[in-house]
């Protein structure tokens, strides 16, 4: 029998089979061809793993960084929250408790104590006296044990309300017209043309009072917020028929209304004639808030109330309402009250205004407390350089070396208080002209324009700012300069070196217009032309321009008074002018009162 091995050998012997050595070579070649591809795949996988690890590391770093920043902000917020909690707990909570105690417990107790105090004082001081309270609810429901003067107060209150209602409808259009700019706009590139006209007063109480044997000595006019007021001294020889005395003082008030198209009409609504009173020779005037106020005196120099009754000078106070209510019109003599350092005040033709129920005027005053500063100002300015004023030996209006200060007169028009004139003084630029100091309402709430007119053609006048409040301050504005030689707050008016101009016989007062921008007007009586003329000068300091217009006169003479008061109407300049002169031909005195209008236009406007 064959063994199993022999059978296998016999099988392979008789059958073909692959050579084992040749098969091994083929397998090695296949493995050699696969090795590079396998390595490439492994390399790619390795690179991918590295990239994934890198990205994972970067993201992990960003997350860690963000967590750190968030933790930092969270810690800061916790600190701030802790601080706020501390403030609320340790500061605000006790404060609220204190406020609650004050408001809830102590304040009602204090108010009750004050109420009891007022009631006790009211009952103690003349409980039967008639009180004149200024609020309407006192008329309707007066308190117990207090007697209210219904007849006086309620009539005044009702009349004022009715007057204000009627006047506002009339004056609204006037006030709108009175703020317009009179000059061409800034875009004007051509020549500015001016045209003037003269108009007689359509209706004038003064002209109706002046008869042939009568003469107006002086006239003072004030215009404010559509209201005008006038006062003048009328001298007449016709004492038997019309008046008891040769001299009478006339006051009139009214509003400016439209008449004949575009012409303003001075419509008189109330007037008063005072005769047989020597204290009305010199008067001031102020208008505003539907009223006229005036201070009248016999002499220009007034000695305020200094305690000596023999040296006191009383001032006649005249008040007129717009529509002539008897209880609003007042006539009373008052003694001015001033600080003991104020020695004298000088009252002439002064124009003021009424604001917040207070009439205010500016006058020269002689104050002992201000003399030192003014003398030092002038002395220091005259040490090294000779100004024209350094040669003066006497100063207006008090004479000698006594330099005047700026005085302010205030008169309260509140009917709940007695009439009183308070005098206060302030230091300002040196005053060369002691006549005609005026006060105009300014665009600022706490100040007005204080003007002093020019004089003799060499002093240009000056315009200052003067405060309205309790503290009286005068600040230089224009037409003044500060000398280099002076180290203190020293200002002098501009004074020319030239000799007095003989062609200018008289200068008027300085008028500040009620426009939004600062503009002012002055007039002169000029004889340089073949015909005499009143020449108007209109200034606009903001634009550094000025305009001149002469109004030729039909007569020739020597003037002694020239007074103007200007306002804006429909964008044009209107002025009420009054002048008195002595005719050369007949040597008689003549007075003229009329209106002038100056219109400014531009030849070419830029688009």
UniProtKB/Swiss-Prot annotation:
Topology, Virion surface side: 56-607
Location relative to the cell: Virion membrane; Host membrane
Glycosylation-annotated residues: 149, 276, 391, 422, 456, 587
Gene3D superfamilies per record: 2.120.10.10
GO cellular component assignments: host cell membrane; membrane; viral envelope; virion membrane
Entry annotated with the keyword Heme: no
TM regions (residue ranges): 39-55
Pfam families reported for this sequence: HN (PF00423)
Disulfide bond positions: none
GO biological process: symbiont entry into host cell; virion attachment to host cell
GO molecular function: host cell surface receptor binding
Entries under SUPFAM superfamilies matching the protein: Sialidases
Keyword Transmembrane helix in record: yes
Segments forming a coiled coil: none
Keywords: Glycoprotein, Hemagglutinin, Host membrane, Host-virus interaction, Membrane, Signal-anchor, Transmembrane, Transmembrane helix, Viral attachment to host cell, Viral envelope protein, Virion, Virus entry into host cell
Function: Attaches the virus to cell receptors and thereby initiating infection. Binding of H protein to the receptor induces a conformational change that allows the F protein to trigger virion/cell membranes fusion.
Designated name of the protein: Hemagglutinin glycoprotein
Biological source species: Phocine distemper virus
